[in-house]
Amino acid sequence: MPRGVAIPEVRQHLFSAVERVIGRDGPGRLSGRAVTVEAGVATGLLYAHFSDLDDFLAAYAVDRAFLVSSGASALSGRAGEGSVTRNLCDAVLATPLETVRPWARLLVARPDLAGGVHAVLGAGTAGFDAIEAAVAAYLADERGLGRVAATADPAALALALVGLLHHVVLSADAGPDAPDASDRLRGAVTALVDGSTATARH
């Protein structure tokens, strides 16, 4: 990035850079310099917007948790429409896995950042917690409409679905020959949920 050139959405530009650093080198190699080199900007730009690296990472964690939470909110009001499985897959994949993966890896490496996310967005209402809550509420609504088996446990299914998402984003190989993570997740969600919806149809 040439010096003197204005960068629109500086924060998002830096957030995208930290995602690439985590994706390539892992969260253990993070530094302010690594992020700014990846972003193609002067090191001082990061510190012009954030007090230090921890402040930057906390802001990034909150921003991406909000994105994930917003994607989960798409389930609200979908009960009774379309396919139960498709609705769930669309909501879980509303935020691209390429965005979810580095964020999740960072939170595993830096669990202290979760406290900052909860302080800003609320405990139990952000990130994976938001997906779990939205899925449980949606499945309960579908159960009430008879589209999910009366014996199904919405909370347990929601927890299992979030566990699948967490496993896929943390274990996925980003290499060119790796299986598509979205396809893996869709297949797993279908296998998890279809039994309950099939039972409801009989």
Label each region the model flagged:
Residues 13, 17-55, 59:
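Helix-turn-helix
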Residues 97-109, 115-145, 154-159, 183:
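Amphipathic alpha-helical packing segments from all-alpha helical-bundle domains
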Residues 77, 89-99, 105-115, 187-196:
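Helix-loop "lid/cap" segments that line or gate small-molecule binding pockets
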Residues 1-12, 197-202:
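Actinobacteria-biased recognition of intrinsically disordered, low-complexity terminal regions
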Residues 59, 72-102, 157-158:
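Hydrophobic alpha-helical connector segments
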Residues 32, 61-69:
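Short, basic, alpha-helical segments at the C-terminal edge of helix-turn-helix-like DNA-binding modules
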Residues 97-98, 137-141, 158-179, 191-202:
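Amphipathic C-terminal alpha-helical segment
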Residues 27, 148-149:
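Conserved hydrophobic residue
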